[in-house]
Amino acid sequence: MNSEMSRNVVSNLKKMNVKLISVTPDAEKNIAYCARVSNPNNQENEKIAGLLKYCINHKHWSIFEQAFMTLEIETTRGLAAQILRHRSFTYQEFSQRYADSSLLADQIPMFDLRRQDTKNRQNSIDDIDPFTKQEFEIQIQRHFASAMDLYQAMLDKGIAKECARFVLPLATPTKIYMSGSVRSWIHYIDLRSANGTQKEHMDIANECKCIFAGQFPVIAEALGWTEHS
């Protein structure tokens, strides 16, 4: 990204993007088939909704490890640190050691500003005065531009990307491929779409939930999920 472009890092709030990369074919049928391993004469039974709901209601979670889904998530380095804590998944993330960070976006997106909840350290409240918010947003935009100018100047002088990246803000965009079993996705979505999760991470989890409901409709219905819930 050239110097002129980096001086104009004035970006609107960026919606996190999540999209499907791959999923086990006939996943729900495969899960039901494997669940009937001890009843081989009934394994070809195509009636699976009742069985999958039974497994969920009685917490027979291991059977949901028989199918997998990979999603692509565009987010920030700050939120990526939260996502990567879910250790039952496997990940590939955009490498700031290998590639120029401006390859993902030529702007660092502005993030939302909310007030700290004094009763819950892991919660924030969206009631900041608009003038206060605007004042800080202007300063943040300048900070982002300065950081990107410094980053590019270091690269131009031959500083290694693995060193120059340390001047970049946590709001810098990144991309993750997140792969896991249906069981892992159920747990992740259930946890991160609930209250107590940072809003931006909750938005990602809800996008994952919509994709999950589209790919695993029988399981989603048994969980009480829909594409829009």
Protein language model annotation of sequence segments:
Residues 1-229:
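Family-specific signature for flavin-dependent thymidylate synthase
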